[in-house]
Amino acid sequence: MRLSLLKTVDVRYCKGFSDDAIASYVLQAPAALETLKLENTNASVPEATQEQGLAAVRQYYEQLQADAVISEHLKVVVTGNGRVGKTSLVQRLQEHYTGSTAKPLPSADDRTIGVEMATLKGSLVMYDFGGQPEYWAWHKLFLTAGAMYLVVVDLTDSTETCTDALREQLGILSCSVPGAVVLLVGTKADADIADAQQRASELNSWTGNWLAERRKVAVKPGVHGQREQDAAAELPRIQGDMLITSSRSLDGIAALAKRMEDLSVQAEPERLFLHYRQPIPKVYQQVGVLLQGMKYGLSTSELLEAVAQCKVAEDEHDVQRQFVSMKEIETLWESAATEAQVALKNASAREVLQVALPILEGEGSVLLSPVSGIVHLNPAWLADAVRPLADHRLHQMTHMEDTAQSMEDRELFPDYNLAHRALREFVQRGIASRQLLEAIWLDVLKTYSVDYATLNDLLCEHKLMFPAAGDRSSDFIVPVKLPKLPPEEFAALCASSSEAAVVVGKVRTRFIPPGLMQMVAAALHHLGQYRCYFRYGGVLE
């Protein structure tokens, strides 16, 4: 009798309950129950759904019980420093899965700018991240829970260089994706296989020590009282020793592909990817089919047929729409759910949509911009939009000069000097005029049929830039382009402000998440006017 009066049930970290047992309890839970905490259990309910509350969890299990299909997509993110061979690795994996002949590898100058996307064997949605530090803050757009992360190092680099890279990348994942599933990959082993094996062994030892230290710090008594299970759950889950590969000799490529396959379906000692090749509610897959059909520009009748069949016809399709408004999706989904007689159970079409979208985002199929009310049907377009702002080549004088000349030739600026001045101010001070943004986005705006205001608002929503103030209110600050050192007036402004509250202290840390200070600057800009700013600080009045 007392159990029926419970308002909160906490089974976090209880691995003894199967997903079926949890589902049975949820579907028969007493009316008094208000909160059910399921973190780090065998529950198949996505974390994003759990965060929506008990009603969403119950809806998930009701839909799963009503009708289920097998999930076929897994997001894989390849990250690491620049020039370590990430793009070559993705190319060799693609060739391995298709059985095609090995093609020439990308040249050293053919580096990834921002993010590149590809799909391997029809199910692995690959995100290949550019490795230059200026890109790391942009990558947070694409870091989501439920993905597999390949952290890549170059085994011809020194052990110190490799450990610095691992510390950086694992730190980013710790901050952005608690509990990320990580596979360590070493490349370029063909240069000296014995040396590569020795370096990989040293890096394995370092990684074990790093995890032990992070766990020790996280659960240090008297600091913030975090439970040991919570601390362990937040750290990257590194899967075994580093895999040694060579994209030139192809050594280790097949072993890497097999390891990825084994991890993707692993059930013991725990399932790492709760939904890949597992049953999910059919109705959520139907939402995904609707979005896929919208991406390909299907007619209303074709969309209804696709939703009813729970698949888009296997004809070759070109992407017609990159993103759509949430309102349009809601209207179409409500119509499709009615016309196709979708089994909604006790939920409304809108409630089902709210639960389905985060699941689809976790698969890598879509990206959500909730403030703007936009769903990105083709996340690659957003990567293309970010790329001109993040382009590391603008720091090279010859590339900046060539770009300025191109802008004059295309009549985007009245003359070369004005274009060069705008580019220089962007690279050196992080300030982008509207004219410069329209110029560097010209191809993006045309290719994706998006207007300047929409793209501007999207990047501001994700704190990738924010409006300047004062007499430059039409310009924008791009935080990741801000200079590392404070301007000359910074010290004087700090000293002259008698009303300022000043706190001086030391923080002992070996890692600050990329983009953290820039995001703080973006979040605070509406509180006043920046008198001056740089990458790690500023004066706001």
Model regions and ranges:
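Leucine-rich repeat
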Residues: 1, 17-26, 56-62, 136-139
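Short, solvent-exposed loop/turn at the beta-strand->alpha-helix junction
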Residues: 1, 15-20, 42-50
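Inter-repeat linker/turn residues at the boundaries of leucine-rich repeats
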Residues: 4, 15, 28-31
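Conserved hydrophobic beta-strand positions in leucine-rich repeat
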Residues: 6-12, 34-39
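Short, conserved loop/helix-junction motifs that constitute active-site signature segments
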Residues: 26-30, 145, 174-178
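Membrane-proximal C-terminal cap and juxtamembrane stalk of leucine-rich repeat ectodomains
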Residues: 34-74
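Extended, non-catalytic interaction/assembly segments in eukaryotic proteins
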Residues: 69-73, 77, 83, 87-116, ...
